[in-house]
Amino acid sequence: MIAWLDPHDPFPPVDRALGPDSEAPGLLAASADLSPQRLLIAYRQGIFPWYAQGQPVLWWSTDPRMVLRPEDFRVSTTFRKTLRRVLDDPTWEIRIDHAFRDVMVDCATTARPGQHGTWITEDVIQAYTALHRRGYAHSVETWHGGRRVGGLYGVALGHMFYGESMFAHRTDASKIALAALCAFLGSRGVAMIDCQQETEHLASLGGAPVPRAAFLAHVREAASAPAIVPWHFDKSVLRRWTARNEQA
């Protein structure tokens, strides 16, 4: 049995999340509340929302937790060549927070193999847009020829970044945005990006699962660090990857 949270109720301890043998490993609580304040409290405790349309807000603390360390971002020989073309071609841009809400809509509406529907409802868009206005949520956008062709969004607290979703309307467009984000965060001393749940795609990019206890210990320290300001960069940060020795 999971807890139902009224608006002012605290989250239960994360060790009360459903275990690996349950139908929903990591499920901790449910609520009707997706306020910006509730989201900030959740992220500081290593908890994230994820639910289907028509369900209450479901709160999760998975064990293990999928993370991506910026220095572990995987750059193949082919993708390194792509990044060099992006750097050399002025029609390619990386924009930050230029169209935050539109990025969320793109993440919600872009078709994905094996996925039907989206959890990024209008209520979710409104909640994260409110976080964006307060300086906590950011988008990293790949533009080509004046068109937004890929991107991602997430939440930044101190020296912690919590990735939420990404989309691509062109091959590698979201991966280019992630490469830029990893280069920027790595240069600012950010050691970990929360990717929430393990997938083959995230693993192919360098993500790896870590025990929940280790993840939470890192979050407690990193999320309380001073905020990264200014939150701004451009495609020049991609040189971090094109200058490195090639990886398989």
Swiss-Prot record:
It is found in: Cytoplasm. One of its GO terms (molecular function) is leucyl-tRNA--protein transferase activity. One of its GO terms (cellular component) is cytoplasm. It catalyses: N-terminal L-lysyl-[protein] + L-leucyl-tRNA(Leu) = N-terminal L-leucyl-L-lysyl-[protein] + tRNA(Leu) + H(+); N-terminal L-arginyl-[protein] + L-leucyl-tRNA(Leu) = N-terminal L-leucyl-L-arginyl-[protein] + tRNA(Leu) + H(+); L-phenylalanyl-tRNA(Phe) + an N-terminal L-alpha-aminoacyl-[protein] = an N-terminal L-phenylalanyl-L-alpha-aminoacyl-[protein] + tRNA(Phe). This is Leucyl/phenylalanyl-tRNA--protein transferase. Keywords: Acyltransferase, Cytoplasm, Transferase. The keyword Acyltransferase applies. GO terms for biological process: protein catabolic process. Its EC number is 2.3.2.6. The keyword Cytoplasm applies. InterPro entries: Acyl_CoA_acyltransferase, Leu/Phe-tRNA_Trfase, Leu/Phe-tRNA_Trfase_C, Leu/Phe-tRNA_Trfase_N. Its main location: cytoplasm. It is an enzyme of class 2 (transferase). Belongs to the L/F-transferase family. HAMAP family: Leu_Phe_trans. Gene3D superfamilies: Leucyl/phenylalanyl-tRNA-protein transferase, C-terminal domain (3.40.630.70), Leucyl/phenylalanyl-tRNA-protein transferase, N-terminal domain (3.30.70.3550). Functions in the N-end rule pathway of protein degradation where it conjugates Leu, Phe and, less efficiently, Met from aminoacyl-tRNAs to the N-termini of proteins containing an N-terminal arginine or lysine. NCBIfam families: aat.
